[in-house]
Amino acid sequence: SVGFKAGVKDYRLTYYTPEYETLATDILAAFRVTPQPGVPPEEAGAAVAAESSTGTWTTVWTDGLTSLDRYKGRCYHIEPVAGEENQYIAYVAYPLDLFEEGSVTNMFTSIVGNVFGFKALRALRLEDLRIPPAYSKTFQGPPHGIQVERDKLNKYGRPLLGCTIKPKLGLSAKNYGRAVYECLRGGLDFTKDDENVNSQPFMRWRDRFLFCAEAIYKAQAETGEIKGHYLNATAGTSEEMMKRAACARELGVPIVMHDYLTGGFTANTSLSHYCRDNGLLLHIHRAMHAVIDRQKNHGIHFRVLAKALRMSGGDHIHSGTVVGKLEGERDVTLGFVDLLRDDFIEKDRSRGIYFTQDWVSMPGVLPVASGGIHVWHMPALTEIFGDDSVLQFG
């Protein structure tokens, strides 16, 4: 007789394993699961584990040709969310072998690629990931990190100051360069291309790069300080992006910029490697993040996107401002700011940190407070972010 019955089987028979002891090499995920009415939470959690690892909707004969026990994701714990009806945190452990080394792209394709459209779930949110050292060690991480950046800039013991050039679209390259010069000459450390400044008809990228480089050198000569302008290398193809980064390097400027979510993790990791090889700092903007992280019960929390960026590589990343927001936001924001900067971060549910994260020796990323802040926010910002941050006005 055949060794299995055809037909749809309950996932929880195979993928819900409450007695499982997680391994130090497992990637652990915390999902906020909202099952459809009538679907038990164990089945919903197991469905997530199955569909994001080895499972499919039925048993197939090729299952016998591999070791499911070795390769399957396991839902090992489920807890109800306090104050929410029919919402659960499902903890899933993935064996390390399911993931390609050094690829954030593959990690996300596996963990969040398919499960979010699942019929048994009303909504699903990835709240946190625990990246084991065995996996994080396969990534280069940030091109330089906080300490090396301070050494390159010769600026210590204070937050770095920057601003975004406005109006963000419509200036000619020459006038744009003028604005950069005035800001840097006036005392800022950095100026920034807006995230939507790429290479538009009114200002092509190469013209902007040349005028900004001129502004940087002039301001440096007059102030005796090292200055920078985040030249946005984001482009329509990754080859064009690398070409723009190479041009920035030839001009001798210290830093380039990338929109990592719209540009994609594959392009970002390539650019990050190039930046380390060529001594460029890399500023990361998170355009499109709110599409993914704004809903409370569906999507991916920004702390996961921040962890992914630290692995893919970036020296700065925009991380919200806290100022003027609700107090609760403050703890959660500081939670992922610590995840960006520190080596070792303890589990702390009050700050939204579901797992203890050990980055071992991976360099840190400077959090950038940007968007709607002005000089009156200064005391609050320095108190919240401390010295290792970039405060960007305008």
UniProtKB/Swiss-Prot annotation:
It catalyses: 2 (2R)-3-phosphoglycerate + 2 H(+) = D-ribulose 1,5-bisphosphate + CO2 + H2O; D-ribulose 1,5-bisphosphate + O2 = 2-phosphoglycolate + (2R)-3-phosphoglycerate + 2 H(+). The record marks 325 as: Transition state stabilizer. InterPro entries: RuBisCO, RuBisCo_large_chain_AS, RuBisCO_lsu_C, RuBisCO_lsu_C_sf, RuBisCO_lsu_fd_N, RuBisCO_lsu_N_sf. The modification N6,N6,N6-trimethyllysine is found at residue 5. Its EC number is 4.1.1.39. Substrate binds at residues 114, 164, 168, 286, 318, 370. PANTHER family: RIBULOSE BISPHOSPHATE CARBOXYLASE, RIBULOSE BISPHOSPHATE CARBOXYLASE LARGE CHAIN. The basic functional RuBisCO is composed of a large chain homodimer in a 'head-to-tail' conformation. In form I RuBisCO this homodimer is arranged in a barrel-like tetramer with the small subunits forming a tetrameric 'cap' on each end of the 'barrel'. This is Ribulose bisphosphate carboxylase large chain. It comes from Cabomba caroliniana (Carolina fanwort).
